[in-house]
Structures are given as structure tokens and as C-alpha cells.
């Protein structure tokens, strides 16, 4: 079977959208250009190392993600190597927003300019708690959908108690309902969890991406979808 390696690009420990000082809301720990340069250096090394895709993951700040997308385009231009760009978002609570405050629909609007292969969710919660947000993405995103949830939620000692079989039972709903194209595992998972997946996907139909929106999408913290019915 073919095997593909995605180069992982994490969110960094800095944010372009929020201040690290509650007494100075305008302060930023770094600039967009500084972050894009850091991403580009990493991505060029990954491309030269032979990765099959660039995976910008655990996205908590959309502006960080946009810097990473820009860096990916520049890195591929510099190296002459073109690979798919994958995005994976993390939501900060059961309200379904990123840490920087966006809904998932608003996030999609923010990155619609880019040539994206897939968009998905990782970390955040276990498979069952992540499902409602995965449904939101699957209904609106004109891309392939990925998911790699945690092995449930951590206990009081920071450990994960969910077994591979229990997690597979929850992930099976994603597959049966046609929500995903790419499945994996995040915090608390090991190869034993991933080993459960081949049996789940055998003969299953993949998710069919939603059509591209025909109306204008504008992004703030929430999506504004401009249609003829709206006087705007």
C-alpha cells in the first residue's frame, strides 16, 4: 500500500492575534513577518527532506495559520517542490471556537483564498465530543476532511484512560456517517489506537466535500454570508 509522510507544522507558542500582556491589549509577542519567516525556514527543511504534504496543525489562531499558509507558498516556490497543504484546527471549548475567538465557519472564510487539500480538527477533545464540530466542517468545507481526536479526556493525573477499542467505537460513527477522509489520533493515542482503523474503513464510502460557496463569505469572529436576500 502507498505510504505518505506529512510534515507537521505546529502553532508555535506565540500568537499574532492576542496580547501576552492583559494590561496592554495592543502588544504582540511577534510580528506576522517574523512568524512567516520562522514557518518558512521549517517548511523548506521539511520539503527538502522529502515530505509528501505540509500539515499546519493544532491551529488556535487564524492569523498564525495565514502566516503559515503564506510561508508554505513561499517555501514551495523557493524549493521548486509542490505538495498538498493540509490544515487542522483545534477548538478551545465546547462552544466550538478557536482560542482567538473564531467559529469554524469563520475560519473557513478566512482561509478560502488558499489552495487547501484538506481541513480538519485535532486535539481538543475525545472523538465523541469532537463529532459535532466535525459535522460543522463537513457540511461547509469544500475540502477533504480530517480528524485526529484525543483518546478521550485526561484524568486528574493528566493521563488518558480510553482504550483503543473504545476510541475506535466512537470513531466508527465518523466513518459510517461519511464525515471524514483522513483519520488519526492525537494526545493519548499510540500505534495501538491507529491499528484499529483499517477494519473500520474497509469498504466504507469516503466523505464527499461540500461544493464551493456561490455567495460571498466574509470572516470576523463569525461568518457573514452575503446573499441577495441580505441588504448589504
Which residues does each PLM region occupy?
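Domain-level signal for soluble alpha/beta catalytic cores
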Residues: 1-232
Amino acid at each position: 500500500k502507498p505510504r505518505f509522510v506529512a510534515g507537521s507544522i505546529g502553532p508555535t507558542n506565540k500568537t499574532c492575534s492576542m496580547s501576552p500582556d492583559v494590561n496592554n491589549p495592543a502588544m504582540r509577542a511577534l510580528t506576522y513577518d517574523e512568524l512567516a519567516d520562522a514557518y518558512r525556514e521549517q517548511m523548506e527543511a521539511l520539503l527538502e527532506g522529502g515530505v509528501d504534504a505540509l500539515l499546519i496543525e493544532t491551529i488556535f489562531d487564524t492569523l498564525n495559520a495565514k502566516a503559515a499558509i503564506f510561508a508554505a507558498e513561499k517555501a514551495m516556490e523557493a524549493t521548486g517542490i509542490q505538495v498538498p497543504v493540509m490544515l487542522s484546527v483545534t477548538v478551545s471549548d465546547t462552544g466550538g471556537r478557536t482560542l482567538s475567538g473564531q467559529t469554524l465557519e469563520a475560519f473557513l472564510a478566512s482561509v478560502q483564498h488558499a489552495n487547501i487539500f484538506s481541513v480538519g480538527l485535532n486535539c481538543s477533545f475525545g472523538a465523541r465530543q469532537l463529532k459535532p464540530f466535525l459535522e460543522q466542517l463537513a457540511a461547509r468545507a469544500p475540502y477533504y476532511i480530517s480528524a485526529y481526536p484525543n483518546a478521550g479526556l485526561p484524568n486528574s493525573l493528566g493521563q488518558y484512560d480510553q482504550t483503543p477499542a473504545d476510541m475506535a467505537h466512537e470513531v466508527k460513527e465518523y466513518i459510517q456517517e461519511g464525515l471524514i477522509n483522513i483519520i488519526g489520533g492525537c494526545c493519548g493515542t499510540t500505534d495501538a489506537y491507529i491499528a484499529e482503523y483499517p477494519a473500520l474503513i474497509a469498504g466504507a464510502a469516503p466523505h464527499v466535500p461540500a461544493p464551493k460557496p456561490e455567495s460571498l463569505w466574509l470572516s470576523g469572529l463569525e461568518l457573514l454570508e452575503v446573499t441577495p436576500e441580505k441588504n448589504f
